[in-house]
Design a protein with these regions (language model features):
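Short, electropositive alpha-helical surface patch
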Residues: 144-158, 188-200, 233-243, 372-374
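Alpha-helix-loop-beta-strand connector modules within alpha/beta enzyme cores
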Residues: 155-157, 161, 199-214
Length: 374
């Protein structure tokens, strides 16, 4: 299932839907985007802790898969279904100890302390709800394939317990996402490409755990992955320009560029690869790479070795396809257009550059504030 929060530009989402991906969403905004993109309601997985009653009603009407995150959501959904004679296909999110710390236990129902089984019992006591899946999401940028194997094994144990007690088959296991891209984490001594597992490694760990869990062959659950970063990060590039070169008080070279953390949110945790876009000096120097924003935290790279750049030189930032176009912000500068390059090399503008008119569209000024003298 394509993770909408990773990059929800319509053109990007439709690329993955054309390849057969369902939609995985965590808000009604993303949910409606998926519907408008042509995804059938039954192929939308509705995750997240913030589902209102109105959100749940829409998901029920469209026969979507509702992943219940907490008891309040469970009770709210159960009451609505019972009062209105509706049916819903549901799953629960399960958090668990996989040996990775800190543990992501703020979402879902805990495996070890019995919360997950208690939630399952409550669901199975409501004939209006059909428990069809089990879901987990154990972390982000996960480098341990063994953690996925442990998570898969624990979900399998729950699925077998459901079968034994209620004679009900869990139709799918959703292992969530968190698969790493080749970006390098800040503070890492090794490049990301040297330490991340391959998708084959992730697949081997997960599928081996499921195949070895003891399911009858004809009752193996469907495996769902909520892939985002690992699929789109590599495909995204940010193009920018050098606007100034200066020396800091300690003598370090500083290069100021026309893109900042407002556009490159992931620079807070990645040391993005940056390269010149033209023939450049053979000499190089360590430098700080600053964005143009009027705040001291606008740092793209705290230390990077690059050729000696000049004002007007162009740069390319690599692997920016994940989370930057959903977490970017309009601050000081307006956001640029986004271009998709087709398989035949044809460029397509898939999001236009913002303008002052764009930003004012949702503003309203009271009449008494429209006249003043300075």
């Amino acid at each position: 299932a394509w993770s909408y929060k990773t990059n929800y530009l319509d053109a990007v989402c439709k690329v993955f839907h054309q390849e057969g991906s369902w939609a995985e969403v965590v808000s009604i905004f993303e949910y409606k985007k998926a519907l408008e993109n042509g995804v059938p309601g039954s192929r939308i997985i509705f995750n997240g802790p913030d589902k209102t009653l109105d959100d749940l009603k829409i998901a029920v009407e469209n026969e979507s898969l509702i992943h219940i995150d907490h008891s309040d959501e469970l009770y709210m959904l159960a009451e609505y279904l019972k009062s209105n004679g509706k049916q819903a296909k549901v799953a629960i999110r399960v958090n668990m100890d996989t040996g990775i710390y800190p543990m992501w236990d703020r979402f879902g129902f805990n495996y070890e302390n019995g919360q997950a089984w208690s939630a399952i019992n409550k669901i199975c006591a409501h004939p209006e709800m059909e428990l069809v899946g089990l879901h987990c999401h154990i972390g982000t940028y996960m480098l341990s394939t063994q953690a996925y194997a442990i998570a898969a094994s624990k979900l399998c144990e729950l699925a077998k317990a459901v079968k034994q007690r209620y004679d009900a088959r869990i139709q799918y296991l959703d292992m969530g996402g968190g698969f790493a891209s080749a970006n390098t984490l800040r503070g890492s001594y090794l490049n990301g490409s040297d330490v991340i597992p391959s998708m084959d490694d992730y697949a081997e760990a997960i599928t081996s755990a499921i195949l070895n869990a003891g399911f009858p062959v004809d009752e193996l659950p469907r495996l769902i992955l909520e892939t985002g970063r690992a699929l789109i990060d590599e495909a995204g590039y940010l193009l920018g320009t050098v606007i100034a070169i200066k020396r800091l008080s300690d003598g370090r070279r500083a290069t100021v560029v026309d893109f900042g953390v407002n556009l490159l949110f992931t620079s807070f945790w990645y040391n993005h690869r940056v390269s010149p876009a033209q023939e450049i000096s053979s000499q190089s120097e360590d430098m700080v790479l600053y964005g143009p924003l009027c705040m001291n935290i606008d740092v793209i790279r705290e230390q990077i070795t690059l050729p000696l750049l000049n004002r007007g030189d162009n740069l390319v930032v690599h692997r920016v396809g994940a989370y930057n176009m959903t977490q970017w912000m309009q601050f000081i500068q307006m956001r640029p257009k986004v271009v998709m390059i087709g398989m035949d090399g044809t460029p397509h503008v898939i999001r236009e550059h913002e303008s002052v008119e764009t930003m004012r569209r949702y503003e309203a000024t009271p009449d008494h504030l429209n006249q003043f003298e300075l």
